[in-house]
Each structure stands twice: as structure tokens, then as C-alpha cells.
């Protein structure tokens, strides 16, 4: 039976870290912090007149960071949000998808770090 896709592909991350567990932990902690900051920024942008340039820059940064650690579903959601271009109401469903996907990533990272202790 195939294992469901995980929010973060640790094997992908391992290819970049040489399987260094300590480095994986550091990268995942840093990503979680930065992701929360970017999500806060996107929520702020979506709650008012979203600045299209800031929306695209933030979603683009999130897309690259997520894909870099192996959080491909989050990276794909960020790519879709980037296409929304910052215009309301188009950003609202994109933001909801980002919230759902990022929450799964946060939980995965939290459990991964807990299991390593």
C-alpha cells in the first residue's frame, strides 16, 4: 500500500543536506519561522487593498522556500496564489489554500522535530 504524500519530503531535503539530521532540524525550524512571517504578510495584504507587487513577491519567495525543503504541496499552492496577482477577491481562496497547506507543514515539522528529540 502506498504511503500518503507527506507535507515535507524529507528525502528531498536530505539530498541537499547530505542527510545531516542537525542541519535538517535547523533548516526546518528556520523555514517554519519564515513561513509564518510570510503568511502573516499575506494575510495583511489580503485584508486590505493588496499591493499586487508585494503579494507576488511574497508568494514567489514562499514558493521557492517551500519547494527547497520539499514542501511541494505548499510550493504549488504558493504558485497558484502568485498567479492571483494580489487582486481581491482572487487572493482570498488562494490565501485559504495557503493557510490549510502551511498548517499541515507546521504540524509535520513540529512532529518531525519532536521525534528527533
Give the residues covered by each predicted segment.
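Amphipathic, coiled-coil-like alpha-helical segments
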Residues: 2-8, 27, 31-39, 65-80, ...
Amino acid at each position: 500500500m502506498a504511503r500518503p504524500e507527506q507535507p515535507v519530503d524529507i528525502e528531498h531535503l536530505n539530498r541537499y543536506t547530505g542527510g545531516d539530521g542537525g542541519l535538517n532540524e535547523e533548516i526546518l525550524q528556520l523555514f517554519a519561522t519564515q513561513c509564518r512571517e510570510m503568511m502573516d504578510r499575506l494575510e495583511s495584504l489580503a485584508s486590505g487593498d493588496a499591493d499586487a507587487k508585494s503579494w507576488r513577491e511574497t508568494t514567489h519567495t514562499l514558493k521557492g522556500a517551500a519547494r527547497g525543503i520539499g514542501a511541494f504541496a505548499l510550493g504549488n499552492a504558493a504558485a497558484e496564489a502568485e498567479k492571483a496577482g494580489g487582486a481581491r477577491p482572487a487572493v482570498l481562496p488562494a490565501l485559504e489554500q495557503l493557510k490549510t497547506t502551511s498548517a499541515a507543514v507546521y504540524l509535520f515539522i513540529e512532529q518531525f522535530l519532536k521525534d528527533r528529540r
